[in-house]
Amino acid sequence: MCIVNFFKTLFKNKKSSNNNEDEFDWEAYEKAVTDHPLHQVFECRKLLEELSEHSIIGLYDSIDAFLFQDIHFEKVISNMPKWVCDEGISPEGSCSKVFYEKFRQKAHHPVFSKFIYYYDLWSIVAAIQDRISAVMLYMQEFYKLVPCKMNYKPEQYTSGSRHGGERETQAHVLLNSIFVSYASIFDLLSKIAVEQFMFDRYDFTNYKEMHCKKEKAMYKPNIKNIDPSLKQNGLLFTDPEVVRKFETFRNEYVHNGPWDLRSSVYYTAVDGEPADVIIYSPDMVDGHFVTSGSRNKFYSHNNRINAQLPDMIKDATLILMRTVDQISALYKKKTVRKEDPKLTEEYLNAIHDYYKSLV
């Protein structure tokens, strides 16, 4: 039973008349949903699902419409050789590099290069959806081990103990996996932004690699070769503080190892009664760890990262949604040509000639 149906059943209004048995106490229902210990996690998941299922799907659609605005897309793609889609991208393609290059040598027409590019770009967009799914999975497992809701202020704790074992290590691994997976979305989206801006420079008679690879495109606030509109306030490329936080945690974990080598989880108490379960994270200023010389992990701010994380994810996801939607809008703005039946026929004939060359 899903959580919504559970609460609807639980809080059905017992005072309702026999003629209206479906009434239930909406006020109690809303309060129960809000008070649920995982309410913030549910809200994060809803936003992440919206990013994946609405914004990213919209990006797929806008790319399809832009790249193939002058042909009958379905007719052409349905005849395209399977290796164009899978080889070098997916385990569905099982040939070697040598065979792939032989296939390419026989596929002379630019239509093959354009569809190879299409699937190259598609794989980056699909990778974003994969990272979103990973974040949701890691978050779900993480909050089975520690709570996202604190019941006390830090100054109220009267005692506490530090635990470090398999369960605590698992919690830290999941937490850092969230940071790594989420921050990788920034890099992937940077590649797509570069591709959108530089597309007109492609010559599909001689396509070898994507511009984002040549440019070594990775996320950074001063990234070049993206549309100026992507540097509006509220979008990814304006260096929002919450994005810097994800970058800081990711980079520390990837390049320097765990920021807590003991994988500590703190079990607090108030007047001898169990209180909050906490993972503390280092002090931060403007999205960066506070540093002094060689040290960058100070713990004076009482940062309870398991409580802060849901808001971080929500804030960053809203930024990503706006950014993805703007990239989609840029593709749509350049989708101005009508379908050309002659070009569609040319592409289909080129594919037919390719198949004949294999005989």
Segments (PLM) and residue ranges:
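A short mid-domain helix/strand-loop element embedded in enzyme catalytic domains
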Residues: I132-T169, F179, D187
